[in-house]
């Protein structure tokens, strides 16, 4: 095990000099001898002359030139397997929940290659989420990748928590949650939410929150993914939740300049597409098991053409776009039914009836969107009878797309609802065909199935 010395510290980036014949490989983990604290560095570049440039996985406070650094001779390795369930870990796989050692039987390196072509599997099976707007407009595939896109404060984390609650309770498999650069409070809420709904013993939690150094946030997604890969390779169907993939990109941007790379568009790192690809290509399903991933994607300034969300789009099977405009109407989940897409919305996969209902809902909402300008200028009375009917149905559909969430019961005061796909299709089909034209539109707001609408209308 070779030993080197620190020769330069610039924020999260540390240069270490080793003997010429014992230079560490790129991605090797190094450990700094700094009193009782363990600090791990990861080699990013070899600069020549025995010098390597590394990213610190913890705070570089207290480091000084001349400190000894040991080469561990392998990449960062984290615990995998059942011992990680119900535990909260950091980027290095160390427990941070005060419950003692993980007691793992095996550790895996966080840098691994993606599965080869012949190992990959293709599944057309749908994953029911119990959320009407998602099941109808942008259905999820088992073993697929889903992105939740939204600006600040439109409900990405709440939507993700609801998805975890619904899928983890209805689906009996294991889940891995990687908190990448999000609020510590949300991580805490999330842990208690999982404990209260008794699914904590099926979830592994890996946190690298906002206050952590960039090296930590850059690698914590890989730590979570490695744990998910282990479950997949044991033949299980795993759920991988990443909140938030944008912070992964941002951490890369923070260290990129310190590593001496030229910035590209909007100041992002030049390796943006490659870094995203390395992570996303590993999140895949093989013939042994599947990884279904749900990733929250922060959209800077609500601009979907920003390089970070735009790069993420290319990797996804379904995109759920949360809209500030819909949130401002008080319709939650604030999913935009015209902007959200899914590869699964194909008559050969979801069936002709589901496909026709989804497209019918879209066309009614699109027509309503076009008529809004006329209504704003001339009023409803100037519309033809046919258009008046379209507007009335569109407003009912818009309200019926809202739904009370289990995880938001404390805010809304109304109990959460899980709606099966069959009931969802039946409800929207009925509205489109005019079966509920006689009911007032407020009866459709914040309910579960269409039967509740009828009950609610009787009380109005």
Swiss-Prot record:
Keyword Cell membrane included in the entry's annotation:
yes
For this protein, what is the EC number? 7.1.2.2
Task: Name the InterPro entries on file.
Answer: AAA+_ATPase (IPR003593), ATP-synt_VA_C (IPR055190), ATP_synth_F1_bsu (IPR005722), ATPase_a/bsu_AS (IPR020003), ATPase_alpha/beta_chains (IPR050053), ATPase_F1/V1/A1_a/bsu_N (IPR004100), ATPase_F1/V1/A1_a/bsu_N_sf (IPR036121), ATPase_F1/V1/A1_a/bsu_nucl-bd (IPR000194)
Recorded GO cellular component terms are: plasma membrane; proton-transporting ATP synthase complex
Q: Where in the cell is it found?
A: Cell inner membrane
Record field: catalytic activity: ATP + H2O + 4 H(+)(in) = ADP + phosphate + 5 H(+)(out)
Q: How does it sit in the membrane?
A: Peripheral membrane protein
Keywords, sorted A to Z = ATP synthesis, ATP-binding, Cell inner membrane, Cell membrane, CF(1), Hydrogen ion transport, Ion transport, Membrane, Nucleotide-binding, Translocase, Transport
Family as reported in the entry's similarity comment? Belongs to the ATPase alpha/beta chains family.
Job of this protein: Produces ATP from ADP in the presence of a proton gradient across the membrane. The catalytic sites are hosted primarily by the beta subunits.
What protein is this chain from? Answer: ATP synthase subunit beta
């Amino acid at each position: 095990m070779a030993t080197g010395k620190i020769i330069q510290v610039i924020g999260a980036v540390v240069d270490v000099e080793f003997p010429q014949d014992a230079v560490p490989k790129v991605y090797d983990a190094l450990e700094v001898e700094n009193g009782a604290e363990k600090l791990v560095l990861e080699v990013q570049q070899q600069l020549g002359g025995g010098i390597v440039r590394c990213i610190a996985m913890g705070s570089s406070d207290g480091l000084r030139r001349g400190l000894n650094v040991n080469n561990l001779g392998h990449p960062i390795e984290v615990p995998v397997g059942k011992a990680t369930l119900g535990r909260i870990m950091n980027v290095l796989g160390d427990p941070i929940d005060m419950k003692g050692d993980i007691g793992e039987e095996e550790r895996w390196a966080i840098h691994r290659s993606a599965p080869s072509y012949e190992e990959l599997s293709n599944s057309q099976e749908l994953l029911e989420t119990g959320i009407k707007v998602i099941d109808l407009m942008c259905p999820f595939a088992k073993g697929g990748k889903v992105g939740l896109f939204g600006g600040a404060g439109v409900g990405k984390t709440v939507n993700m928590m609801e998805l975890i609650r619904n899928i983890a309770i209805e689906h009996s498999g294991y889940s891995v949650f990687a908190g990448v650069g999000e609020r510590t409070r949300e991580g805490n809420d999330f842990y208690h939410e999982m404990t209260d709904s008794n699914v904590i013993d099926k979830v592994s939690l890996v946190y690298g929150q906002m206050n952590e150094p960039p090296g930590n946030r850059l690698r914590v997604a890989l730590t979570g993914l490695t744990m998910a890969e282990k479950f997949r390779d044991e033949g299980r169907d795993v759920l991988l939740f990443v909140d938030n993939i944008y912070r992964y990109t941002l951490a890369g941007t923070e260290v990129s300049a310190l590593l001496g790379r030229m910035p590209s568009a909007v100041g992002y790192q030049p390796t943006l597409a490659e870094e995203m690809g390395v992570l996303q290509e590993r999140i895949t399903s093989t013939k042994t098991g599947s990884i279904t991933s749900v990733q929250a994607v922060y959209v800077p300034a609500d601009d979907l053409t920003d390089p970070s969300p735009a790069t993420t789009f290319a990797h996804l099977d379904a995109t759920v776009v949360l809209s500030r405009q819909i949130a401002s109407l008080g319709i939650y989940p604030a999913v935009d039914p015209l902007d959200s897409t899914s590869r699964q919305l194909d008559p050969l996969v979801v069936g002709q009836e589901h496909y026709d209902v989804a497209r019918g809902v879209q066309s009614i909402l699109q027509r309503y969107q076009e008529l809004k300008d006329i209504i704003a200028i001339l009023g409803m009375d100037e519309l033809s009878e046919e258009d008046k009917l379209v507007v009335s149905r569109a407003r009912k559909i818009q309200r019926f797309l809202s739904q009370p969430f289990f995880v938001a019961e404390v805010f809304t005061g109304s109990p959460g609802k899980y709606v099966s796909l069959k009931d969802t299709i039946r409800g929207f089909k009925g509205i489109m065909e005019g079966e509920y034209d006689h009911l007032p539109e407020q009866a459709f707001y914040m309910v579960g199935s269409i039967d509740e609408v009828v009950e609610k209308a009787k009380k109005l």
